[in-house]
Amino acid sequence: MVEKRTQPLARDAMAYVLAGGRGSRLKELTDRRAKPAVYFGGKARIIDFALSNALNSGIRRIGVATQYKAHSLIRHLQRGWNFFRPERNESFDILPASQRVSETQWYEGTADAVFQNIDIIEDHGVEYMVILAGDHIYKMDYELMLQQHVDSGADVTIGCLEVPRMEATGFGVMHVDNEDRIIAFVEKPADPPGIPGNPEMALASMGIYVFHTKFLMDMLRRDAADPKSSRDFGKDIIPYIVEHGKAVAHRFTHSCVRSDFEREAYWRDVGTIDAYWQANIDLTHITPELDIYDSTWPIWTFSEIKPPAKFVHDDEDRRGSATSSLVSGDCIISGAALNKSLLFTGVRVNSYSRLENAVVLPDVTIGRHSILRNVVIDSRVVIPEGLVVGDDPELDAKRFRRSENGVCLITQTMIDKLGM
């Protein structure tokens, strides 16, 4: 039976963002910060995409569970997401692992990260829970997923991507019937099941789940009492519901948000150096796959009061310039040339230097006569004069973190070891 609606379902929902992961495949980039706190797109943090989706979808109650090296993430949330008004029935809760349920345990898994705050969730009295991963780049209207959940009468609705079948081996994969009811859920299968009518494609979990709140609370209490459980949604909660209840797949193509310039549904896991670099560099294209300029679906974030970017010097061999690049506020390009690069706030690039396919995080200083190609430079790094990266693969690999595709991650610790 379809429920009668007098207001958007999102107004009776809470978004709960799981943001405690390290993101170890990003190597030194997450030595000082959790993966959701990693910078993206010249201005934002990765977590801002899930949070902006929730806000733009109409959800006004949000909780964020943090754990690994959470200081920079918590500071960002406190500064950039402090505009919710309790008198308007809005809330934004930052929920660090604090041993609320057990004096000896931190968050043991994704399900436990929700269970340990079960009293806070129940105090909000919402009808629906939208569980989100805080470490993916995408634009999605969760209201449409909530509508499908209610209309289908599902116990859980799982957001999913259609991916080539043999590329789905690293995901949780859903085997569905012709009505997208999930009949099996397999974590990282060697031979993923195909989609009915399209056997070369598979449905991969996005780590997005919609529940009726009471049902989820019952499932979490049951799971917490099971000594064999690993306290994880993908390994424990979802397989149990698939077997004993009704689980339905929600295809991302049904709720992805696209501007007039976006042709395909865009979702990225920027969990490796190569994927992170590529997703940022893609934004420099004339028509990027992800439109961050879409004013109808803004990506909210903390925005410091900074002066505009500045380009100085106009001599033949010393001209401040940028082509096919994104340059954020408070950057000074002093007689240097940028091509297909993305600079976050506060970057200084000094004379005669050249950057190509470079992702430069905030407050970096690049010395004169430097040539940097295919790099990710961590925040607050000081690049010495005359440094060349991107010409000699063997030398680059000895000095920096060089990826499979030849992208060099540069940190201050690596620079200090050069002795330049």
Swiss-Prot record:
GO terms for molecular function: ATP binding; glucose-1-phosphate adenylyltransferase activity. Signal peptide: none annotated. GO terms for biological process: glycogen biosynthetic process. Keywords: ATP-binding, Carbohydrate metabolism, Glycogen biosynthesis, Glycogen metabolism, Nucleotide-binding, Nucleotidyltransferase, Transferase. The keyword Glycoprotein does not apply. It catalyses: alpha-D-glucose 1-phosphate + ATP + H(+) = ADP-alpha-D-glucose + diphosphate. It is an enzyme of class 2 (transferase). Gene3D superfamilies: Hexapeptide repeat proteins (2.160.10.10), Spore Coat Polysaccharide Biosynthesis Protein SpsA, Chain A (3.90.550.10). It comes from the Bacteria. InterPro entries: ADP-Glc_PPase (IPR011831), ADP_Glu_pyroP_CS (IPR005836), GlgC_bac (IPR023049), GlmU/GlgC-like_hexapep (IPR056818), NTP_transferase_dom (IPR005835), Nucleotide-diphossugar_trans (IPR029044), Trimer_LpxA-like_sf (IPR011004). PROSITE patterns: ADP_GLC_PYROPHOSPH_1 (PS00808), ADP_GLC_PYROPHOSPH_2 (PS00809), ADP_GLC_PYROPHOSPH_3 (PS00810). CDD domains: ADP_Glucose_PP, LbH_G1P_AT_C. Alpha-D-glucose 1-phosphate binds at residues 107, 172, 187-188, 205. Pathway: Glycan biosynthesis; glycogen biosynthesis. The keyword Cell wall biogenesis/degradation does not apply. Homotetramer. Belongs to the bacterial/plant glucose-1-phosphate adenylyltransferase family. This is Glucose-1-phosphate adenylyltransferase. It comes from Sinorhizobium fredii (strain NBRC 101917 / NGR234).
